[in-house]
C-alpha cells in the first residue's frame, strides 16, 4: 500500500516538472520573438531619413529642424532602445528560475519600449516627408506665380484699352509682385522653408485676386460705358412712345430717375480705376435694381391696359344684368307679396341693391370719362374696375338667390297641394280596404287616426284659401300630415296582414279539433281574440297550438299570406 502511495507521489511530481518545463518552453518562444523584434527595429533607417534633409539647403529653419530631429534620434535610442537588451536579459534569468509572471512583465516592458521607438521613427518619417513635400509645393507655387506674373504683365500691355483708367494701377500692382518673388528666393536660400511657404502662398492668393479683377474689369467697363447708357436711352424713348399711345407714366418719374441714375453711374468708373470693385458692383447692382423697378411699373401699366380692355365689356354686361334683374325683382315682389308671405328684409334688400347698382353705374361712368382722356393711368383704372367687378358680382349673386327664392315659393305651394291631394286619396283607399277586409269591425284607433287626418286636411285647405300664404308654415304642416298618413297606412297594412294570417291559422287548425282537445281549446280562444280585434295575440295562441301537432306548418302558412 505504501509503495503505491510513493509511486503516485512520484508520478505527480514528474507531471508537475513536465508542466513547468513545458511552460518555460512556451515563454522561451516569447523571449525569442522579442529578440527578433529588437534586431529588426535596430535596423530602422533613422539616419537615412535625415540624409534626405541633408540634400536640402541646411540653413535657417531647415537646419534647426534637422538638428532637432537628429537630437530626437539619439534620445529615442537611449530612452527606448538601449533598455530593451537589459529587459530581455532579465526575462531570461527569471525564466530560468521558473518566475513566469516576473519574466512576462519584463518582456511586456521591452515590447512597450520598442513600440515607443517605432512610433518615434514613424514620427520622424512623417516630419521628413512633410518638409520635402513643403519644399516641392513651394517650388510649384513659385513657378506658377512667375508664369502668372509674366502673363498678367503681358495682358495689361496688350489689352490696355480694355482696362481703361485702371490699367496704370494694375501695372503698378503687378510690378509689386517682382520683389516679392525675389524675396521668396531669399527665404528659400536661407533654408526658411515655412516662411517661404507662407510667403509664396499669400503671394499666389493676391495674384489670383488681381487676376479675377482683370477678368471682371472689362465686363464692368462695358456695362458702365455701353450697356447701362443704352438701357437709359431705350427706356427714355420707350416711355415717350407709350405716352403718345395714351399712357400716364408720371408716377414712374422717368426723367428724374434716369438723371439720378446717370449721376450715380458717373461714380462707378473712378471706383473701377481705383480697383474698388466691390463698391463698383454694389453701385451697379443698385442702378440695375432701380431700372428693374421702373420696368416693372411700366410693364404693369401695359398689362393693366390689356386687362382693362378685356374686362370693360364684361363689367358693362354685368351692370346691365344687375339693373335688369333688379327691375324684374321689384316687379315680382309686388306681385308675389299679394299671394305669399315675404320677409320685409327681402324687399328692403332689393331697394338697397337698386341704390348700390346706381352708385356703381355712376362710378363706371366716371371711369369711362377718365379713360377718354389723352393720358390714362391704367393701373388705377384696373383697380377701380376690379372693385366694380367684385361688387357687381356679389349683387348679382344675391339677386339671383332672391329670385330663385320667389320662384321656389310657387313651386313649394304646388308641391304642398299635390301632396295634400295624394294624402286624401291614399287615406280613402286605406280606409276602404279596412272596411272590405275580413275584420269583424274597423278598430277604433284607425277611425280616430282617419278623423285626425281629415281635420288636419280641412285646416290646411282653409289656409290655402287665405292670402298671403305663409308657404314655409304650410309646407311644414303638409309634411306632418304626410307622416301621419304613412303611419296610418303602415299600421293598417299590419293589421290586415295579421287578420288574414290569424284566419288562415284557425282555418288550418280546424282539422285537428276532433283529435286534439288542447288544439280545439286554443283555437276557440284564438277565435274569441280575433272577434275582439286582438289579432297578434290570436296569432300567438294559434301558432303555438299548430306547432304542437305539426311543427313548421305556421312558417309555411305565413309565407303564403305574405305572397298574397
UniProtKB/Swiss-Prot annotation:
Transmembrane portions of the chain: 5-23
Extracellular side, ranges: 1-4
A cellular-component GO term for this protein: septin ring
Segments forming a coiled coil: 99-138, 190-223, 271-300, 350-435, 471-550
Matching InterPro entries: EzrA
Bilayer disposition of the protein: Single-pass membrane protein
Pfam family name, one: EzrA
GO terms for biological process, alphabetical: division septum assembly; septin ring assembly
Name of this chain's protein: Septation ring formation regulator EzrA
Source taxonomy: Bacteria, Bacillati, Bacillota, Bacilli, Bacillales
